[in-house]
Amino acid sequence: MAETKVILTKSVNHLGHPGDVVAVKSGYARNYLFPQGLAFAWSKGAAAQIEAMKRARLAKAVATREEAVAAKEIIEGSTVEIAAKVSESGKLFGGISAEKIAIALSSKVEVNPKNITVEPIKTTGDFPATVALHPEITANFFVKVVAE
């Protein structure tokens, strides 16, 4: 069976990332990659366009890394205070989620709640937390839970 060179437009498991030129079976390209919008046929003109996209992506990665370093300087070692309803014994009604922590952090820096790592919080007190700002950069901070 003949192979066809394609340029990926999105990440495909076991194949590559956007902008990669890969050789795949013709049927796989025609029946899956092209209809799903995951790739388009390789050509010299398209290859030049992809190189420009890769350079732009690299420049963007450098910019986001610089933003992550700036955000780390703001977040590192700081304390975020969250007020929650508490029972008489000091336990929370519910818990403190990563979403609530992200909302509290938004006064300093916007972060994705999925990037926040914290142990389950069920009582008042200070708790360590970590946020991944970039694949190479993380910031440690504290979450202070107080009674409402």
From Swiss-Prot:
InterPro entries documented for this protein: Ribosomal_bL9 (IPR000244), Ribosomal_bL9/RNase_H1_N (IPR009027), Ribosomal_bL9_bac/chp (IPR020594), Ribosomal_bL9_C (IPR020069), Ribosomal_bL9_C_sf (IPR036791), Ribosomal_bL9_N (IPR020070), Ribosomal_bL9_N_sf (IPR036935)
Pfam short name (any one): Ribosomal_L9_C
Keyword entries, A-Z: Ribonucleoprotein, Ribosomal protein, RNA-binding, rRNA-binding
GO molecular function, one term: structural constituent of ribosome
A GO BP entry: translation
GO cellular component terms, A-Z: ribonucleoprotein complex; ribosome
Family statement: Belongs to the bacterial ribosomal protein bL9 family.
Stated role: Binds to the 23S rRNA.
Protein name: Large ribosomal subunit protein bL9
Organism the protein comes from: Bifidobacterium adolescentis (strain ATCC 15703 / DSM 20083 / NCTC 11814 / E194a)
Lineage: Bacteria, Bacillati, Actinomycetota, Actinomycetes, Bifidobacteriales
Gene name for this UniProt entry: rplI
